[in-house]
Regions:
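Concave beta-strand-loop units of leucine-rich repeat
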Residues: 33-43, 53-64, 73-84, 92-104, ...
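Hydrophobic anchor residues at the C-terminal helix/turn of individual leucine-rich repeat
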Residues: 28, 50-51, 70-71, 90-91, ...
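Canonical leucine-rich repeat
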Residues: 45-47, 67, 87, 105-107, ...
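Non-core capping and flanking segments associated with repeat-based/extracellular domains
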Residues: 19, 109, 129, 134, ...
Length: 158
């Protein structure tokens, strides 16, 4: 009975059975000459605190559920169709953040973002007051019911 249950879980969630934390050694296998880290479709479940990425960070289609405090991305963040649920305050992204189809429910206060914010097709319920987006903000097909007070969008609002 238990074996059948375990087999079913492994078949339904193949990434859960073989996922692990990205460490400083395995990170080297995914960095290109420009400082970009591409983890798309890789079996990682978490990122280390204080990770510094000189270029772009791509965690699309991964089991990574949270962006740790102190994460510094020198380029943009791609997290489309990922398991990402939580972004910790203190994360810095110099470019845009594309979270289309991720599992994010709220965008925290204290995240530095230098470009657009795409939250399309997410279970997003709220945004922080006085959020400033230096590009477009997309909340298409989200269950968000109202926009926060003091919202500033320098681009278009979708």
């Amino acid at each position: 009975m238990f074996r059948g249950f375990l087999l079913t879980i492994c078949l339904l969630c193949p990434w859960a059975a073989n996922s692990y934390e990205l460490d400083s050694y395995s990170k080297l296998n995914h960095v290109d000459n420009y400082g970009n880290i591409d983890l798309r479709n890789k079996p990682y479940s978490s990122l280390p605190s204080g990770l510094v990425v000189k270029g772009n960070l791509n965690i699309s289609k991964t089991a990574i559920t949270k962006l740790p405090k102190g994460l510094d991305v020198g380029g943009s963040l791609e997290a489309t169709n990922s398991s990402l649920k939580k972004v910790m305050p203190g994360v810095s992204i110099k470019g845009y953040a594309n979270l289309l189809g991720s599992q994010i429910e709220s965008w925290p206060k204290g995240v530095k973002l230098g470009g657009y914010l795409n939250l399309t097709d997410t279970p997003l319920k709220r945004l922080p007051n006085r959020l400033k987006v230096k590009g477009d903000l997309s909340v298409i097909r989200t269950p968000i019911e109202s926009l926060p007070e003091g919202l500033v969008v320098e681009g278009n609002l979708y």
